[in-house]
């Protein structure tokens, strides 16, 4: 399809889309939010708003209540500054330098070959639009914009008591209009390290890159139940199955880019005796047919490629290669258990998100999620057992708590009542199998009442990401209704 530049700033509601258009123009992948943060600081100061930044890089912006609303409970509008940097293989894009190129595609806004950053740029845009507005009724207002949510929740981990004064927090990082979230999964990162040993092999060798491509990928929390294929797991399966009958020697393996994204592509550099390159090609063709038979209805674009490579490094020793591929092939992945308490919601899962070959080791990166601590601990035990069998190390880091639902939440009831008043139907009250920052916010602010909501965003964390235009208008209308309905603060 020919790319057509669209002026999304003219979409309705214009205040939100205009800010989102500006956000798209400023690079802000995880770990590189400083340029966008400085833009927002300068903008807030220009509007006469009080703005501060803490040691974690989080931004805090305050706006006084509108006349007559000074006695209402304080509200914190919250979003995160960073976006997931994912692109198609044939897309030339540097996320640290190049702007996102959004365009209108029917009822949606998407981007040209990259993630759009509607997660959480649309929430950020709505927060700024409220700060900028002179015609929205609200009580004492704060905006909290956190850093590096997508790659470690660094800003949420670094948030300290005393910076916020509000009673209610509205997290804008949910992705289905008409749903409101009152709980989320916790998680922990796992890193499994395979020390490398290499050995030279003699003979006439042919060297190839074998690649899994064309998978849908997606968010390892909200999309994990869909059964979308994991490129790292498929590649490990192929290599393990054909390890002996094609006499492959592994040079390097790589796949995925983020723990919290289902990997769409994975590649292995291998060497085979020149006499066996036809056998390898046959194995590739057979596995490609198998993938189409197994996954074709869900993963219509899945392909297996075989191309020559100039990787001239010595292969791994047979012992290291066998141990590595057996572990990757055996590693659990996907849904581990569905919740008994919340029907239709995943309780526990894990995602083999990244495999990297480094100078002295190969590292596999997982993200474990669970609504309950014991579920997370069970999967950690699985990976510890796998590492023990493979005689390698596994490390766990970055654990963050879940967000326990509060059935008596006042802001939840306000959301429900205002939503029904606007749309004459009930919203869906949800618990999400993904990590929202609210669980971490509860540690320094245990008494803060919280919900999460947002417009409809499909395929976050992938180049197919898109946001529904009409849903942004509904979300904006709902946000204004909530702010107007915030009750008077009592002692």
Where does each model-flagged region fall?
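Acidic/His- and Gly-rich active-site-bordering loop/insert found
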Residues: 2-108
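Zn-dependent metallopeptidase/amidohydrolase metal-coordination segment
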Residues: 8, 13-16, 340, 347-360, ...
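Midchain, well-structured core segments that form catalytic/ion-binding scaffolds
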Residues: 27, 107-110, 150-151, 157-369
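Active-site metal-coordination/substrate-binding segment of hydrolases
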Residues: 69-151, 156-167, 318, 329-333, ...
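Short, conserved charged micro-motifs
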Residues: 70-71, 274-283, 373-379
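Active-site-adjacent substrate-binding region
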Residues: 223, 230-232, 236-253, 405-448
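His/Asp/Glu-rich mid-to-C-terminal helical/loop segments that flank catalytic regions of hydrolases
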Residues: 228-245, 274-277, 323-329, 337, ...
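Substrate-recognition/cap regions that form aromatic- and gly/pro-loop-enriched pockets
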Residues: 345-434
């Amino acid at each position: 399809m020919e790319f057509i530049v669209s002026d999304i700033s003219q979409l309705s509601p214009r205040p939100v889309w205009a800010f989102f258009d500006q956000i798209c123009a400023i690079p802000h992948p995880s770990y590189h939010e400083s340029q966008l943060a400085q833009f927002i600081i300068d903008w807030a100061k220009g509007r006469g708003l009080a703005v501060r930044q803490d040691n974690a890089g989080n931004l805090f912006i305050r706006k006084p209540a509108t006349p007559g609303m000074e006695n209402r409970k304080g509200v914190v509008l919250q979003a995160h500054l960073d976006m997931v940097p994912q692109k198609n293989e044939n897309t030339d894009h540097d996320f640290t330098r190049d702007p996102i190129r959004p365009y209108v595609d029917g009822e949606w806004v998407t981007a040209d070959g990259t993630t759009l950053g509607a997660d959480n740029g649309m929430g950020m845009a709505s927060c700024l639009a409220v700060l900028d507005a002179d015609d929205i009724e609200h009580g004492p207002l704060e905006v909290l914009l956190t850093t590096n949510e997508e790659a470690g929740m660094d800003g949420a981990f670094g948030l300290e008591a005393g910076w916020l004064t509000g009673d209610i927090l509205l997290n804008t990082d949910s992705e289905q209009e008409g749903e409101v979230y009152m709980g989320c999964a916790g998680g922990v990162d796992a890193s499994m390290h395979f020390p490398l040993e290499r050995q030279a092999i003699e003979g006439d060798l042919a060297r190839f890159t074998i690649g899994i491509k064309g998978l849908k990928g997606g968010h390892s929390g909200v999309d994990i139940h869909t059964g979308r294929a994991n490129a790292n797991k498929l590649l490990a399966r192929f290599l393990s199955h054909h390890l002996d009958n094609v006499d492959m020697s592994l040079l390097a393996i790589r796949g995925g880019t983020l723990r919290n994204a289902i990997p769409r592509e994975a590649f292995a550099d291998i060497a085979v005796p020149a006499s066996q390159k036809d056998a390898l090609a046959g194995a590739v063709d057979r596995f490609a047919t198998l993938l189409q038979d197994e996954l074709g209805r869900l993963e219509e674009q899945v392909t297996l490629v075989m191309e020559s490579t100039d990787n001239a490094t010595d292969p791994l020793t047979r012992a290291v290669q066998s141990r590595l591929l057996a572990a990757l092939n055996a590693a659990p992945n996907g849904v581990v258990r569905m919740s008994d308490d919340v029907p239709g919601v995943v309780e526990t899962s894990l995602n083999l998100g990244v495999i990297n070959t480094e100078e002295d080791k190969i590292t596999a990166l997982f993200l474990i999620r669970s609504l309950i601590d014991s579920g997370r601990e069970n999967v950690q035990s699985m990976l510890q057992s796998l590492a023990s069998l493979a005689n390698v190390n596994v490390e766990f880091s970055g654990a963050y708590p879940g967000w326990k639902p509060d059935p008596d939440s006042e802001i939840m009831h306000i959301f429900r009542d205002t939503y029904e008043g606007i749309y004459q139907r009930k919203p869906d009250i949800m618990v999400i199998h993904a990590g929202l920052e609210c669980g971490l916010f509860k540690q320094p602010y245990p008494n803060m009442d919280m919900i999460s909501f947002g417009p409809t965003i499909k395929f976050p964390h992938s180049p197919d990401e898109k946001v529904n235009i009409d849903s942004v208008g509904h979300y904006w209308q709902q946000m204004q209704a909530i702010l107007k309905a915030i009750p008077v603060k009592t002692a």
